[in-house]
């Protein structure tokens, strides 16, 4: 197997390939141009988008040429793959704004140089497409019977598949054809839920050009408990730090299950596999902290990763810099005259609604750090928090449950 493909396989990026021997032989001959697509249906990428992007960087490092295709055209429809219902339609203007934000995120992560890594946008060839001509030229090569055998469509047939979504596979296949024509792109990579779309694109190019191209998919990443990776209590784990604060991003990885550590090291860091295995075989808490730091450094930079790590240490009583913790400011007068503990938690937006906070306190899950640095439980929902609750720095460190912290600064 070609060395680049072996790297993907060793790190857990390999699920299916249309012709692994043919692709391996092509890669042995020299650089292969490949692409991964991302639809800008939201203002930020989330962790679910990261696997193809890490694969892109591994292939690029091995000498191949990557294209990040931003799907401003396909985002107008929405991909039915992996969805139980039709994606909510958003305006063209909102899609264009999302494109700008996502391109900037990808550029920080990938570093587009226009040679070894570049972007394209399928809006260029889809926005003004003549539908009749498209049906004659492209649609005539597709079998409805075969399309309905693919998992993405079979699942949606149970809940209702709209005609507009049914067109998505044709459009994604057309993307592959256009990238083959524009950039000599010979490989599409993506999650395994894209297998049907990728195979259809490979087949379309063969029919239209007689050229052989390839498709490769990655396993859909789930946690060891079977849940979707990157999902939190607040929803998706976004790369935009305004949507998911860096501290929360760090803490997500710091708190992954023991069984997931090695897998996530291989997928979401660039450390050699042997080093990933060595770290994961050692102290598991140290391994999780290293995992969290490595991923946060890749996405947000080393300085932000250091701050998040220091904030986590301070939150959990292991030293560190508490100014790096999530912080809320409240009026000094509220503390001076006293504020009910439920109202305090609500004021700093920790613990959910007031009824949630009441239950949290009644179940013994609300804490503060006293002047001696000792964490103390709020045992009474009627507790009034005043200046005697402040720590030696005149601040409050609050905790809700096992993992949510807030540094409260009185102004």
Language-model segments: residues:
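Divalent-metal (Mg2+/Mn2+/Ca2+)-assisted nucleotide/phosphate chemistry catalytic cores
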Residues: 11, 91-92, 98-99, 103, ...
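N-terminal catalytic cores of NTP/NDP-binding nucleotidyl/phosphoryl-transfer enzymes
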Residues: 22-80, 188-195
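Short, hydrophobic/aliphatic alpha-helical segments
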Residues: 29-37, 66, 173-182, 222-223, ...
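Flexible loop/turn segments at secondary-structure boundaries
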Residues: 43, 75-77, 127-128, 196, ...
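Short acidic, glycine/serine/threonine-rich loops at helix termini
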Residues: 78-82, 129-135, 227-233
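A charged helix-plus-loop insertion that forms the helical arch/lid used to bind
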Residues: 80-96
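Conserved nucleotide- and phosphate/pyrophosphate-binding catalytic cores
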Residues: 204-411
């Amino acid at each position: 197997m070609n060395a680049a493909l072996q790297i993907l396989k060793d790190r857990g990026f390999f699920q299916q390939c249309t012709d692994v021997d043919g692709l391996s032989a092509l890669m042995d001959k020299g650089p292969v141009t490949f692409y991964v697509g991302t639809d800008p249906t939201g203002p930020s990428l989330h962790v679910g988008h990261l696997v193809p992007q890490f694969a892109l960087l591994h292939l690029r490092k091995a000498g191949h040429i990557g294209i990040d295709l931003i799907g401003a055209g396909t985002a107008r429809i929405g991909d039915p793959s992996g969805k139980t219902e039709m994606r909510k339609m958003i305006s063209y203007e909102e899609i264009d704004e999302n494109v700008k934000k996502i391109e900037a995120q990808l550029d920080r992560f990938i570093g587009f140089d226009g040679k070894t890594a570049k972007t394209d946008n399928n809006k260029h060839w889809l926005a003004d497409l003549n539908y009749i001509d498209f049906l004659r030229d492209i649609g005539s090569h597709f079998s409805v019977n075969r399309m309905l055998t693919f998992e993405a469509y079979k699942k949606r047939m149970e809940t209702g598949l709209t005609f507009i979504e049914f067109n998505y596979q044709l459009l994604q296949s057309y993307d592959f054809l256009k990238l083959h024509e524009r950039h000599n792109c010979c490989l599409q990579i993506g999650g395994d839920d894209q297998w049907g779309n990728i195979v259809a694109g490979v087949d379309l190019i063969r029919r239209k050009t007689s050229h052989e191209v390839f498709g490769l998919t990655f396993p859909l990443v789930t946690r060891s408990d079977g849940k979707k990776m990157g999902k939190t209590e607040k929803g998706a784990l976004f790369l935009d730090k305004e949507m998911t604060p860096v501290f929360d991003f760090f803490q997500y990885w710091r708190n992954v299950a023991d069984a997931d550590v090695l897998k996530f090291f291989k997928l979401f860091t660039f450390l050699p596999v042997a080093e990933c295995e060595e770290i994961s075989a050692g102290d598991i808490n140290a391994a999780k902290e290293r995992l969290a730091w490595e991923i946060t450094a890749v996405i947000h930079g080393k300085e932000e990763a250091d701050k998040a790590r220091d904030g986590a240490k301070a939150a959990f009583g292991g030293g560190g810099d508490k100014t790096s913790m999530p912080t809320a400011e409240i009026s000094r007068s509220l503390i001076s005259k006293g504020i009910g503990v439920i109202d305090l938690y609500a004021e700093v937006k920790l613990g959910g609604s007031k009824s949630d906070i009441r239950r949290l306190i009644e179940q013994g899950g609300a804490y503060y750090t006293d002047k001696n640095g000792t964490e103390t439980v709020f045992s009474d929902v009627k507790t009034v928090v005043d200046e005697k609750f402040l720590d030696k720095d005149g601040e409050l460190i609050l905790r809700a449950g096992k993992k949510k912290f807030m540094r409260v600064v009185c102004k």
